[in-house]
Curated annotation (Swiss-Prot):
The keyword Membrane applies. This is Na(+)/H(+) antiporter NhaB. It is found in: Cell inner membrane. Belongs to the NhaB Na(+)/H(+) (TC 2.A.34) antiporter family. It holds the Pfam family NhaB. PANTHER family: NA(+)_H(+) ANTIPORTER NHAB (PTHR43302:SF1), TRANSPORTER ARSB-RELATED (PTHR43302). Na(+)/H(+) antiporter that extrudes sodium in exchange for external protons. Keywords: Antiport, Cell inner membrane, Cell membrane, Ion transport, Membrane, Sodium, Sodium transport, Transmembrane, Transmembrane helix, Transport. It is a multi-pass membrane protein. NCBIfam families: NhaB, PRK09547.1. Signal peptide: none annotated.
Length: 520
């Protein structure tokens, strides 16, 4: 007997998502207009919490769907306007271009990346040393490249590793789905679970590494550039100003990496299973034997394009996304990828996340229009100058954990500059606050995927369901790093930032510009 149209509509709504999840979302959609009618401020915070919930349930349903429904309703009931959302997207066009083109560009270099990281995996048998290598490499690259680019590279490599083992273990062709484990026997399934744990730990070490390196330089994160511009700092000024906080935090982050691996706590410590190592080694040997001069030339070209990529990004020759587009053009042209469908595969990873990020901008527009952060900012500016540093750091960290850290950093640096213009603080205090804001948005935000765009990209990537990396598991695995980075950062902001900056000023390494210079 055929079901009714109403039942069919309900089954189609969010597809295979659990019934309880569908009912929750329907409840949100009914509740929000009612709360907005009573209190727009409360409704705004409710929307933020609901959006975080959809991110937390990313493995139940891709957040674009439920989050998008909530955002569309927010527009309809007047929590924000379509024009404001357009402005937010326009303001973040560089990030959108980055996601569309840079992530796709990395796809065309995956042969070289897989070769390099396969040698790295097979060459370093110690899991602790391997974790350090991933964490340090991610930190170094993120100091000069964008964190999303770095994470995209590591994701591409991890999917490659997973695919090699899964296809061999399940006796399937390259085109088969990687999510289906039905063909695996119990022994191979157990090995696969250990391999998943191994990949999860490497991905988290690399993800945290992007935060450790990204905080150090003005090009490491988008909000760093905004803060540096507001304070009138050059690349060297920024590096030195942030060093009293960023260097101790980096050292403690590396120590944390070693400790969690040695103690095998918080989901870390799983070594590469020997059956997987054997398969990867056999794959590497076969690839080497089958490699023709044409294949070798492709690897050489990809290596040269990699040099171009790093050089162009380090020298800021163009917007990151446009550099990514040049990578696509060069790699596809010189490696002979001419079919439209083959080129189209490069974009399948990034476009859903780009759409999700646009929905996120709609939520940011609601946060601005409903003045959700206004009470917190007012409270912080009422504190004494010395306490302002730690309060700015803590509230930046708290809000960056639940919201976009680019948005939070922008809001706080604008408020600090407004206080400078009104004579509430002087130029020196403004520069101290700029460091507190920068470190506050970058360090504690590793607590959840919401704060770090790179973490959110990892959570919603094709890799996450393969290695069983859920929102809750990411929060749990990030917890030791969150505690260490937050507390060490807070201690440095409170105790070492001011004296070390005074020493830099006295030594002539940096200088405080006149207040009038900062106001322009």
């Amino acid at each position: 007997m055929e079901i009714s149209y109403g039942r069919a509509l309900y089954r189609n709504f969010l597809g295979q998502s659990p019934d309880w999840y569908k009912l929750c979302l329907l409840g949100f959609l009914i509740l929000n207009p009612l709360v907005f009618w009573v209190s727009p401020f409360t409704a705004g915070w409710l929307l933020v919490i609901e959006f975080i919930f959809t991110l937390a349930m990313a493995l139940k349903c891709y957040p674009l769907l439920p989050g998008g429904l909530l955002a569309v309703e927010a527009l309809f009931i007047g929590m924000t306007s379509a024009e404001h959302v357009r402005e937010e997207v326009a303001n973040n066009l560089a990030v959108v271009l980055l996601l569309i083109f840079m992530v796709a560009g990395i796809y065309f270099m995956k042969q070289l990346l897989l070769l390099i990281f396969t040698r790295l995996l097979l060459g370093i048998r110690s899991k602790t040393l391997l974790s350090l290598a991933f964490c340090f490499a991610a930190a170094f690259l993120s100091a000069f490249l964008d964190a999303l680019t770095v994470v995209a590279v590591v994701i591409s490599v991890a999917v490659g590793f997973y695919g090699i083992y899964h296809r061999v273990a399940s006796n399937r062709d390259e085109g088969q789905e990687l999510v289906d484990d039905a063909q695996l026997d119990d022994e191979r399934r157990a090995t696969l679970e250990r391999f998943r744990a191994f990949l999860r730990s490497l991905m988290m070490h690399a993800g945290v590494g992007t935060a450790l390196g990204g905080v150090m330089t003005m090009v490491g994160e988008p909000q760093n550039l905004i803060i540096a511009h507001a304070a009138g700092w050059s690349f060297g000024d920024f590096l030195l100003r942030v060093a009293p906080v960023s260097v101790p935090v980096f050292i403690c982050g590396i120590v944390t990496c070693i400790l969690v691996e040695k103690t095998k706590s918080f989901g870390y410590g799983e070594p590469l299973p020997e059956p997987v190592r054997k398969i990867l080694r056999e794959y590497d040997d076969k690839s080497r034997q089958k490699r023709t001069r044409q294949d070798t030339m492709k690897l050489i070209i990809q290596g040269l394009i990699g040099v171009w990529l790093i050089t162009a990004l380090a020298l800021h020759l163009a917007e990151v996304g446009l550099i990514g587009l040049s990578v696509i053009i060069l790699a596809s042209s010189l490696c002979g990828v001419t079919d439209e469908h083959a080129i189209g595969k490069a974009f399948t990873e990034a476009l859903p996340f780009t759409a999700l990020l646009t929905v996120f901008f709609a939520v940011v527009a609601v946060i601005i229009d409903q003045h959700l952060f206004a009470p917190i900012i007012a409270y912080v500016l009422e504190a004494s100058p010395h306490n302002q540093l730690s309060l700015f750091y803590l509230f930046n960290g708290l809000l960056s954990s639940i919201s976009d850290n680019v948005f939070v950093g922008t809001v706080y640096i604008n408020e600090a500059k407004s206080a400078l213009q009104q004579g509430v603080i002087d130029a020196k205090q403004f520069e101290m606050l700029a460091v507190a804001i920068n470190t506050g948005t970058n360090l504690p935000s590793v607590a959840t995927p919401n704060g770090q765009a790179a973490f959110l990209f990892l959570l919603t990537s094709a890799l996450a369901p393969l290695i069983r990396l859920s929102y809750g598991r990411m929060v749990w695995m990030a917890l030791p790093y969150t505690i260490v980075l937050t507390l060490v950062g807070l201690a440095c902001v409170q105790f070492t930032l001011v004296p070390f900056t005074d020493w830099l000023l006295q030594s002539g390494w940096v200088s405080t510009p006149a207040t009038t210079a900062l106001l322009h």
